[in-house]
Amino acid sequence: MFKEFKEFALKGNLVDLAVGFILGGAFGTIVTSLVNDIMMPPLGMLMGGVDFADLFISLNGTEYVSLVAATEAGAPVIAYGKFINAVISFVIMALALFFVIKGMNTLKKKEEAAPPPAPPRQEVLLEEIRNLLAKNQ
């Protein structure tokens, strides 16, 4: 039973999948940092100094200075700024994945388009003999 599990676990596809999950998690962290630390500050500055992560609506009618203050006060809030950041992260992740898959598909097509190898010399000779025999009959 252990041998079967070992064969299953070490198959190329399963190992590739595990590596993909690990790299995906790491890439997700990079994309989140790209959105929150690189893209959103200049975008917020262009929008009048707004930090998108701090955009929220207080549902109890009380106004709070920031999302942190509202959360600390226990107020129910809709943190739509965090949602905007998440949507932008998703779009960037989806675009990156699209380009990776598109590149892989292009490479696969190039591999498939390679001409088939020449038949072995024996086959060529046998075909010639067959053709000569058919011609003489």
Curated annotation (Swiss-Prot):
This is Large-conductance mechanosensitive channel. InterPro entries: MS_channel (IPR001185), MSC/AndL (IPR037673), MscL_channel (IPR036019). One of its GO terms (molecular function) is mechanosensitive monoatomic ion channel activity. GO terms for cellular component: plasma membrane. It holds the Pfam family MscL. Belongs to the MscL family. Homopentamer. It comes from the Bacteria. It is found in: Cell inner membrane. The chain crosses the membrane at residues 15-35, 81-101. Keywords: Cell inner membrane, Cell membrane, Ion channel, Ion transport, Membrane, Transmembrane, Transmembrane helix, Transport. Channel that opens in response to stretch forces in the membrane lipid bilayer. May participate in the regulation of osmotic pressure changes within the cell. It is a multi-pass membrane protein. Its main location: membrane.
